[in-house]
């Protein structure tokens, strides 16, 4: 199975359209998979027995999730068959105090809980959602927050934050006349969204280091493509989708440490801390590692933390594992050179019409696109 589904440059779509993880048990012989992981990071591992029996690892086993059959693709949410994710995110790095953080959690929780009240088109899904009311209040910016404030503060905020959400869920579920949520917290991978607030993504350290190119994909019919081209951004056709263009944005993160400065054991340790004190669902974590220096530590790390996580995946560091990766590390000189070549984006052109594409005001807008009229 791992060989068949692993990434193949000659047939990339097969692996990219699947979630290549193994349902492991405590005591699995992880050494059998180290060579595959060192090649391209696959397979990942999920521990269904932990997901079914535990919420937070700081709390006793409760067995509430005995119906769980798997995870969502990024593995932050254990799910029953036909169950959906309901996710909302809080940025740790945007809070001035713990009180400010706890207040944000209230509104994040209320949004997530409200979404569980909305029916879907599938009757079987509605039944599961009404029974579980599962939500995933996620944190991002955890690694940089830990670097700046220390792990004791991280544990304190997480533990008190979790208990605060549980208190709100008890009160508001009674008020709404619905069940309390089976699980309420999680950690998403949060790659793109974290860029908006300058946060490190989810539980990860900055993948691209201090200076990097962030690859973001746009449909070829997206009017933004014309603006990026006019401004001189580096663009190239997506190698997988013929209808998609990859645009590379230069980023100076300014984070205290990047992923290459952090050991494999510290990375998995922070994920376990988050699973223990914050997330009663799961923690989406991809452990980057130095292929030459840390491959020998992969199996020991898994044996050490297999009972303290619900899922984990790996990725060798560097820019050559996969083409068109989300993050490509560059030097300061390369960053300055690229920034010097690009122009300021003319955002007003979206509404003035660009190359026969005109956005119809704010009609039918989602978070990503608006209705487009093709002249």
Sequence positions of predicted segments:
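Conserved, charged catalytic cores of large soluble enzymes
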Residues: 1-63, 136-166
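Domain-level cores of phosphate- or acyl-group-handling catalytic modules
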Residues: 1-12, 124-125, 170, 181, ...
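Short, well-ordered loop/turn elements at secondary-structure boundaries
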Residues: 10-11, 17, 29-33, 38-42, ...
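Inter-helical turn/loop segments and adjacent helix faces that build the functional surface
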Residues: 94-99, 120-125, 146-157
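Catalytic alpha/beta core of large soluble enzyme barrels
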Residues: 35-37, 44, 54-121, 131, ...
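Active-site-adjacent structural elements in folded domains
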Residues: 120-132, 179-180
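Flexible, glycine/threonine-enriched loop-and-boundary segments that flank and lead into catalytic domains
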Residues: 164-192, 198-200, 352-359, 364
